[in-house]
Design a protein with these regions (language model features):
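An N-terminal hydrophobic leader/cap segment in hydrolases
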Residues: 1-44
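Conserved alpha/beta-hydrolase
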Residues: 71, 78-100
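Alpha/beta-hydrolase active-site loop
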Residues: 103-124
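Gly/Ala-rich beta-loop-alpha elbow adjacent to hydrolase catalytic centers
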Residues: 127-136
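Hydrolase active-site cap/lid region
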Residues: 144-189
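Short beta-strand/loop motif that positions the catalytic acidic residue
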Residues: 202-204, 209-211, 215
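Conserved alpha/beta-hydrolase "acid-adjacent" motif
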Residues: 216-222
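Catalytic histidine-centered segment of alpha/beta-hydrolase-like enzymes
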Residues: 241-253
Length: 265
């Protein structure tokens, strides 16, 4: 237990929550070379405007990056899709890149994904990475319908893990307890954590999970667990690509695009 005054505990507790909901931004937002000549669109969402880019006409693959990342993750797959004549839509999630809002969470990101899909459609598939996978799943559980999804290096987030990470960083127990109380009172719509494994059981889209066995951020068992829960899902396990490079590896992207195009099952 800390011996900090109650006002200090309150301030520290709110700092813990802010750190959970506020991604660290780059000093200057950036755009992938592939999207420099793309059609850009600022899309209004219930939580503020987000930036998006469409490259190509017709049914498109929506590309959803992860936590503290941005549209630049998708330069390699956008180039490949462009060469094949497949349209893509990229976005910067709330709190990221060119999007103006500061806070984000899976539910905020899910609403943004749904809004971009509606504004930049038609969307016939989603490729997500890390946090973007879970936000996309939540958007789908709320009604966003797409025939195919490919999820790369998904996490399986739990609120208990977030509080444990705070404890591991040395945050005192009474500060964490106060942060939990504030979170439950002021963020009631987020207090019940979205359960990806339970949601996967009811999904209708064809799904492909992709994971590198040496992922330093999210264990490959996450994809294996989600694949088992998701009816008819497929999985690609690779190695030596870590958490982010797996979303840019040429051979892996070829297999993802084959799946999105309907050639991979």
């Amino acid at each position: 237990m800390s011996e900090a005054p109650s006002d200090e505990i309150e301030d520290l507790a709110r700092q813990v929550i802010d750190a959970m909901l506020t991604p660290k931004r780059r000093v200057r937002p950036r755009i992938a070379e592939a999207f420099r000549d793309a059609e850009d669109m600022e899309v209004e969402t219930p939580d503020g405007p987000v930036m998006s880019w469409r490259l190509g006409k017709g049914p498109a693959t929506l590309l959803v990056h992860g936590w503290e990342d941005d549209n630049c993750l998708w330069g390699p797959i956008a180039d490949k899709c462009y060469q094949l004549g497949r349209a893509v839509v990229a976005m910067d999630l709330p709190g990221h890149g060119f999007s103006k809002s500061e806070l984000t969470s899976p539910d905020v990101a899910a609403r943004a994904i749904a809004a971009v899909a509606a504004a930049q459609g038609p969307i016939d598939s989603i490729v997500g990475h890390s946090f973007g996978c879970i936000a996309s799943m939540q958007a789908m559980s709320l009604g966003l319908a797409v025939p195919r999804v490919a999820f790369i290096a998904p996490p399986i987030p739990r609120m208990s893990d977030r509080w444990q990470r705070a404890a591991d960083k040395g945050v005192p127990d009474d500060v964490i307890a106060r942060a939990q109380a504030i979170y439950a009172a002021e963020y009631a719509d987020r207090a019940t954590s979205f359960d990806p494994e339970a949601a996967a059981e009811d999904m209708k889209a064809m799904a492909l999970f992709v994971h590198s066995l040496d992922d330093e951020s999210c264990p490959a068992s996450n994809s294996q667990d989600l694949k088992r829960a998701w009816p008819g899902a497929k999985i690609i396990l690779t190695d030596e690509l870590g958490h982010r490079l797996v979303a840019q590896d040429s051979a892996t992207l070829d297999r993802i695009i084959d799946f999105v195009e309907g050639f991979g099952g």
